[in-house]
Amino acid sequence: MKKILLIAVCVMALVSCSNVQVMGFDKVDASEVIVTETYKLEAFEKIDVKGLANVKIIQSEEKNGVVELKAPDNYIELFKFDSKDGRLVIDLAKKVNLDAKNVLITVYTTDLIGLYNSGVSHVKMDSLDTDKMEVINSGVGDIEIGGVADDVKLVCSGVGCIRAKEMKALNVEANVSGVGSVTCYASEKIDGTVSGVGSLKYAGNPKVKNTRRTGIGGISEL
């Protein structure tokens, strides 16, 4: 058990680094010239992050479907944005290693019901007003989200975390099966499962508490 915990701690330490390198990919050094490119895409209500970047999401009617990329000028062509069938996919156009500390992708959308990270990214949304929301983190990185919602589903199966304590939800379904953690807020009902090495922490003093734990992870109330 001690060995498993040590592995988990080491992996989480690697996740905290802003410059994750993938073996076999060429390294592209960042230039010192920072530029901003703006893209107008089809409207979307789901966002899928697959690349390596810092992503900020803003709920906005005026700039709905707009994506802004601020990065070193030689990094601009390395990113691609595709919006189709209500889903925005953020990915790298080439298989390269880059330094993401000076890369910021700002996404504007009227509504958001799904947020997915399968890359190596930090994704943040401070204030979201929606009826339902699904957040899945299966990559290496973290998702931070706040706002209000009726029903929220949180799934962490990768190496990272979902921080949703500031997402004031009525009902939360949370599942942790990887090496990571989920923090959340539920005022009516929490349905939580931990089957990995990670942890689930919840606030809001929900009226109904259904929690299940297998493995060496933990579940606790904040």
Predicted features and spans:
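Intrinsically disordered, low-complexity terminal regions
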Residues: 1-157, 161-222
